[in-house]
Amino acid sequence: MPLPFTSSLTGALALGFSAATLAATTSPGPLNLGEVNINAQSVITDNATTEGSGSYTTGAMSTAVGLPLSIRETPQSVSVITRQRMDDQGMNDLNDVVKYAPGITLRKFGGDRQQFLARGFIIDNLMYDGLPTSLSTFTLDTIAGADLAMYDHVEVVRGATGLMSGAGSPSATLNLVRKRPTATPQVSITTSAGSWDRYRTEVDASNKLNEAGTLRGRVVAAYEDDKSYIDERDKQRQTFYGVIEADLSDATTWTLGASKQRDDATSDWGSLPAGPNGEDLHLSRSTFLSNDWAYWDRDNVSLFTDLTTRFDNGWTSRLAFAKTWAESNTFSSYLSAAKGGGFTQSSGQYDTTDVQTNLDGSLSGPFRLFGREHELTLGASRRQEKFDQKGGFWAKATPIDIYNFDPGVIPKPDIADRTPYQSQNTATEEGVYAAARFNPFDPLHVIIGSRLSWYKYDNRSGTGDYKVTQQVTPYAGVVYDINDTYSVYASYTEIFKPQTQQDVAGSVLKPMTGESYEVGIKGEYFNGELNASVALFDMTQENRAYALDTQPASCLATNRTCYEAAGEVRSRGLDAEISGAITPDWQASAAYTLVLSQFVKDKAFDKGNLFAPNQPKHLFKAATTYHLQGDLQKVRIGADVLAQSATYGRVGNGHAEQDPYAVVGLMAGYRLDEHWDARVNLNNVLDQKYWQGIPTASGSGTYGDPRNLMFSLKWTL
């Protein structure tokens, strides 16, 4: 059952948006519309930038509802991975963020493939500066490995986020916020070297480009050359980022930027297998079961721009556009369980392009109603993903000995002999959204929002086109300030996800609907330098495709499986987190997540069973850094830990299991002088052997990194 406050929140959704007819005005005086007054003196501040703050928390974030709210003011479980924390823990790409972010699980499928999970569901939405990007099964292979050199911080909102992200699962949204130019000179060079011949260099420079400082620019470049604890594995990465900001007037700023990331890697696509019923085959962590000619290369180019105007009355308009061209080229191998035991290896070659285009226009600011000040945001967005994959596979299956495999023995197959494969589709989503934060009296804040979406899927390589028209996604939240430190809150959020399965009549099933109910308490200490929260959540995803137990003759005659939108899963649990400054010299972040997920309506053998066995029931993550005092004031020390309960994956008639484990990291840094800083990170101190991706009978098993060391030296202007 949903939490007790369901009915009251559902009733609140009926409230209209009478304030939605307001428009921003540049007039220095207030705009009066009867009882409504837009006050020029009301300003919503956004102090979300974390670079240079030295903090593990942030003052504001807008991912949840499009308004710059503090963590305490947001009626959902939200977190941030700041620039300081990225640097302290030596995070280099998005996988590192996911590994350490509260409540999120990183699942690997080899060195080049990954999946993110939260509250039992797959995360299929990323944002870049607030613009959503789709993450489908194969786009994860092309765009998810974002290098962090160009980002200021990553915001995390757990639960359904349909108001701002549109279609997706009720899991979480990650918002990667880019670095911006500074008006003062800023230059840094960081070089790192570590275990398995891993090397990395970053250069970051920013300054004003004219005397007045109205034109500013920033460039970032990074190069990484990684070997691996896995035999044959290596990767080279090149990252470039450039951005300029121009103040067209005192009120208007135009931003234009571009980035390029190139990854060239030796691929272990198939990765490591389990036995036919999940048995542990006790393979070493260095085992490589692909070939020395295998590769997985990726190229991502992004262009973005936005025009922001700040009106005298405190309102802000923003028009943002982004386009990403992502390519993935792979030629690699995968395993299959052989009849009678053992394994065979087959190969595949695929060229994938994924072009995503995003446009968003919004207007937000304060207004007065019945003598009280409130905030409103209005917007419209359009995003399109054009996906093309061409390639093929080879039917030939070569028997291999997984314990004595030589990557140089099996020759590279001839392209002419492959069985061709092609997948081409275009998904387009358009929407309008609105959210208002009402402040009826001082301790109480009510957020009401809604999104209206149109979704179209065009299968350009076959049949199965479909549309979703006027899908309504509501949002409701209540925050009550107990005192200057603590607030309690409750929220109801939704999200929808289209699906491709068809019913008996041949019609595409209606979208899945995800609902999230959440109640919690948040605390804000030391003027926002430290944030803490505890939340209970209860989520369902309904209308899931459910294969009919008895397939009608009409379905059998057309060689297709028919479904009904009858499946349902439920996820309940707890989120607890504290992050920020405990003292001026002590930064810390600690988070615990409890997830209980199960099938409610599904096949007989699934009903009541665990829905997400590959996400742990208990998950604990913590990181801390302390600056010593006195004669040791140039020294800082830190530690981090990731601990989780058991997980498993269904394999044959059994399970492949991962027992509970904990991974500990240590850090020490030394400030040599005002320009030079040294740091060393010792990861997996106890050399814990664990699966970061649980194996199946055909592969996918990926070990977490063994104990390793990384030295870093940074020069700052």
Regions found by a protein language model. Give the residues of each.
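Gram-negative outer-membrane beta-barrel transporters
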Residues: D442-P443, D538, E564-V651, L686, ...
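Outer-membrane beta-barrel translocator/receptor signature
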Residues: S134-L135, M150-D152, L163-F240, L248-T252, ...
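Short acidic/polar hinge/loop motifs at secondary-structure boundaries
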Residues: T105-L106, Q115, L131-R158, L176-R178
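Membrane-embedded beta-barrel scaffold of Gram-negative outer-membrane proteins
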Residues: D306-D312, T316-A322, A326-S332, T513-A581, ...
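C-terminal beta-signal and adjacent terminal beta-strands/loops
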Residues: L642-R650, Q658, L666-L717
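Structural signature of Gram-negative outer-membrane beta-barrels, strongest in the C-terminal barrel
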Residues: E245-S249, D354, E373-T377, S381-E385, ...
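Surface-exposed extracellular loop regions of Gram-negative outer-membrane beta-barrel proteins
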Residues: R262-N277, Q384-Q389, V478-G523, G528-E564, ...
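Acidic/polar loop-and-plug regions of large Gram-negative outer-membrane beta-barrel proteins
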Residues: E224-S228, Y241-R310, K323-D354, A397-N425, ...
